[in-house]
Amino acid sequence: KKYDTSTPKYEKLLEANYKPAEVNFYLAQNWYMRKKYDVAISHYKKSAILNDKAAYMPTLLLHSAISFEKIKDKDNAKSFYSTLIDLYPSSNEAKVAKQNLTKL
């Protein structure tokens, strides 16, 4: 339930333009955990645009793919799973992506 209380804090940080790539990622994670996948996708996208080399990119790609899957957008889900596998083949996230991709 920390997600409910931390979201406004992250939104204030965004307003102050404080580390916008990271803050968008953490906001996306909050919305993802609350099953608000459309909002999560929006924040993941902003984060990736601002810093596509961040250490959290494998998680961002995996959670984006799962979010697309949850909102029944299989094409984008497949695309994100494939990108994750291509860019981070030895990551734990890529292992999950491979499993999830076979189910689509």
Across the structure, where does each feature detected by a protein language model lie?
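Canonical tetratricopeptide repeat
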Residues: 26, 63, 97-100
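Terminal, low-structured helical/coil segments at or just beyond the last alpha-helical repeat
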Residues: 77-104
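Short solvent-exposed coil/turn linkers within tandem alpha-helical repeat scaffolds
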Residues: 14-21, 50-56, 85-95
